Structure formats: C-alpha cells, structure tokens
C-alpha cells in the first residue's frame, strides 16, 4: 500500500511532516509499522485527517510491552471541537492485546487519557484490524476494567478517576464498582465504543 500520498497532505505543516517522516524512516520496526497503520487510516478518511483538523502528532515509543509508550502521549491530537479529540493508534497482535490488563505502562497511558477527556467520545483507540479482531480487543479491555475497577474508583487525589468522572465517561447510572463491572461484562456495551478499527 502506498502511504506517500497521505503523508504528502502534511507537507505544509512541517511539525506534523517531521513526525510522520521520523516514524516512517525509523530503525524501530514497531514504530514504522505504527506509522503505516496511522497513514493507512489517514488515507481511508482524508476529510477527517486534514492538516487543519490536527493539532499535533506525537509517536513516542519506549521499552515496554510491544513498545507501549511509557510517557503517555497521544498519537494524534485534534483541534478543540473535533471528535474525537485524541486518537491512539495500536498495531498490536492478539497476543499482545491479551496482556494489556497486566501491563502497568498501558494502564497508566489509558488512565491518563481518561483523566484528560470529558466525554468518552473524545477518545478513540484505532486498532489494526489486520493484526487483531475488535472483539479480542474489547475482551482485553474487559479484563483491564475488571482488574482496575477499584483503582479507577479511587479519588483523583489518590490516583483514580473518582465516581463523578466515571459517571461522566461511562454512564450516569453507575453508582458503584459493581454497576461499572456489570456494564463492562458485555463487550457490546457502549462503554467499549472508543475501540475502533481502521
């Protein structure tokens, strides 16, 4: 597949062009693959991914599970008023997805997104459907929610999201951890709508 055309759209934005070029020419295979995944998504939806709509692109990879980023930065941040506000491109295979519930770096990154957004539709995890099935990914997040529910419900000053924020993101009908876990049990519940395929 040719991504040059999608990349060239950003020539007039040197800040974005530089990030795309860095990713595409990286000696790190996972970073190159992640950049291709992002560009192939850009190519499929050129009206959404315009230089005018994107505020920032940031692809940082660290030494963690399948290069999960330890410094918790988004891949694409859209300008205020765009939906979503943040997109995180994940080119993981099924095996890697199955490990996210036990990966502190992944959990920390996900929680930092949840703290950053006001509505769940402000966040999208763009998965590479050539490497994993969306239901496998939802299942992996279900395990993460089950494992992390108590931490998410902690007060913000204790590192959690707190009940108010959870209700804002996942539904006003949530009164406690058990309500949240009931929703998480069904991978077709709207709480999983932030998981998208390209």
What are the residue ranges of the model-derived segments?
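Acidic-basic catalytic patches of nuclease active cores, encompassing PD-(D/E)XK
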Residues: 2-68
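Surface-exposed polar/charged interaction patches
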Residues: 6-13, 22-27, 41-45, 116, ...
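Alpha-helix boundary/N-cap detector
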Residues: 8-11, 15, 26-29, 33, ...
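Short secondary-structure capping micro-motifs at structural edges
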Residues: 62-66, 74-75, 110-114
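Active-site beta-strand-loop-beta-strand hairpin of nuclease catalytic cores
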Residues: 66-89
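Catalytic cores of nucleic-acid endonucleases
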Residues: 83-84, 89-154
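Non-catalytic C-terminal interaction segments of nucleic acid-processing enzymes
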Residues: 147-198
């Amino acid at each position: 597949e040719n991504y040059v055309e999608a990349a060239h759209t950003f020539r007039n934005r040197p800040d974005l062009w530089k990030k795309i070029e860095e990713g595409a020419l990286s000696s790190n295979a996972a970073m190159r693959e992640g950049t291709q995944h992002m560009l192939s998504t850009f190519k499929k939806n050129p009206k959404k991914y315009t230089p005018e709509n994107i505020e920032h692109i940031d692809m940082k990879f660290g030494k963690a599970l399948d290069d999960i980023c330890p410094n918790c930065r988004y891949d694409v941040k859209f300008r205020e008023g765009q939906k979503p506000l943040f997109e995180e491109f994940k080119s993981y295979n099924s095996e890697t997805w199955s490990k996210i519930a036990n990966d502190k770096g992944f959990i920390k990154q996900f929680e930092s997104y949840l703290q950053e957004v006001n509505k769940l539709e402000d966040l999208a995890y763009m998965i590479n459907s050539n490497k994993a099935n969306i239901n496998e990914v939802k299942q992996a997040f279900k395990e993460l929610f089950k494992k992390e529910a108590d931490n998410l419900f902690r007060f913000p000053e204790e590192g959690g999201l707190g009940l108010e924020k959870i209700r804002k993101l996942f539904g006003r009908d949530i009164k406690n951890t058990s309500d949240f876990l009931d929703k998480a049990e069904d991978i077709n519940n709207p709480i999983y709508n932030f998981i998208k395929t390209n």
